[in-house]
Amino acid sequence: RCKWYGYQYSEILRSLMCVYLCGGSCVEDVTTHLMRHLSLHPSLRTCSADTILRAIEELTCQNTTYQSASGRVYDFNTADKMNSLLVNALLATGQLKAGQEYDFDFDHQFIETEKYDAKPTYKKFLGYSPGVAVIGDVIVGIENRDGNTNVRFNQKETLERIFKRLEASGVHVARARMDCGSCSEEIVGMVEAHCKHFYIRANRCSSLYD
């Protein structure tokens, strides 16, 4: 955030976490119930619920709609601002260090939800299927997708954005690991360009046994 803003993201995130760590159930509790107590802390600058919600809105990203070769339409959300803040926060807290190399894992997770835009997944429930990148036990990138999206559809672009964001922050991937949902020529070629070694499980097919 611009330094001329009243609160930085670090202060806003601390205020948001205080809601849940102090027994609150919604963001508004920070103003109505917790502010008078949190204000006694000598170094914690606690912001109002309105400020927290405005900051969250600043980080939102409009969906991008893609059309497949077969004519089907899928919504993606790249969450660029949120992902950039995520990487910066991991660097600021020392969970990632610039100049070091890490092992990188990527997979799609299926999240069940009853939201209005949820789509049927192959797991037989409505939801989303975000692509999630992890280093160790911390998430370093996440992009949401419709639940009915084929796992390989535009996966190359998703991975490339995540790799480039990490590289721009000085974080490099030594080894990348993915399951057979990433086993395609274009995805393998892109992954190879951004890491020293990669492990991608091959699809089961008759040619493997020939």
Language model features with spans:
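Basic, short loop/linker segments at the boundary and entry of helix-turn-helix/winged-helix-like folds
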Residues: R1-R14, F153
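Short, basic interhelical loop/turn and adjoining N-cap
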Residues: W4-Y5, M35-R54
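Short, conserved catalytic/metal-binding motifs centered on acidic residues
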Residues: S15-L16, V30, C47-I52, Y102-F110, ...
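Short, charged amphipathic recognition helices of the HTH superfamily
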Residues: C22-M35
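Active-site-proximal, Lys/Arg-enriched surface segment
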Residues: R45, I56-V132
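Short, basic/hydrophobic alpha-helical segments
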Residues: L85-Q95, K156-A174
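Electropositive, glycine- and tryptophan-enriched low-complexity nucleic-acid-binding patches
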Residues: T121-S169
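Catalytic or ion-translocation cores adjacent to nucleophile or general acid/base/metal-coordination motifs
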Residues: N144, F153, E192-D210
